[in-house]
Amino acid sequence: MKTDLKHGDFKQLDKNLWVLDGELPHHLPLPRSMTVFRMNDGGLWIHSAIALDEKRQRQLESFGRPNYLVVPSKMHRLDAPAYKQTYPSIKVVCPEASRAKVEEKVAVDNSCENEFQGSEIKVHTMPGAKPIELAYELPLASGGKAMVFNDLLVNVTEVKGLMGRLLKFIGRVGAFRSPPSNKLILINDRALFHQWLDTQARRNDVKIITVAHGDPVTEKISQRFTEAAIQI
């Protein structure tokens, strides 16, 4: 697997859950994050893939066999072709509503909604949000659940440089939240999405949240969901 973009090391969040951060093209200061989950059969579920150098690729393979490549939206197709080329048998899945756009870059085997029906991975079509991206609920070996989001919620607390200040000004940077631009791009009913986030805040089984941009949330989960809901 070849990449010219920098990335960090894998960080283990639970026995079967890891994240890895990388940079975007053109030196954009907004970080991107990949989530890797080892399923019950030992295969890997990879969300918002980041192309890896040889060392991290071997580390990924030590976790398990790459089985699923989740392309979460048309905005996260960048490294999907590299994964398909490296792992020809990997199954490429995406939200049904994003399939046409994703297939402009890589062949899609199935929709997430169909592929994971009845499996250990629960797919959430979020009320009030356009179905072009989804949320995913994963069982943790330590007990409880992890939830994986794409662009609807971010958790970027620090960026550098002039472009970073611009991103902060337009609301792309901040503690766990839905950026203001989502109200035009990804959210079609703010009241419904607020209600859905509020419902998640009342759960006590979510222990970890990962996002495609920013750090994972591992503490005060209910409070963070409530804060995100208030900002919608």
Give a label for each model feature.
Residues K15-L20, W45, G118-K122:
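Short, hydrophobic/aromatic-rich segments at coil-to-beta transitions
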Residues H26-N67:
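Pre-active-site segment of Zn-dependent metallo-hydrolases
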Residues R77-L78, R99-V102, N155:
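Short gly/pro/ser/thr-enriched loop/turn and capping motifs at secondary-structure boundaries
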Residues K2-T3, D9-K11, P25, W45-I46, ...:
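Metallo-beta-lactamase
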Residues A51-C94:
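Active-site metal-binding motif and surrounding structural segment of the metallo-beta-lactamase
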Residues P88-P139:
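Hydrophobic, well-structured mid-protein blocks that either form specific transmembrane helices
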Residues H47-I50, V70-K74, C94-E96, M126, ...:
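Short His-Asn-centered micro-motif
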Residues M1-D41:
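Zn-dependent metallo-beta-lactamase
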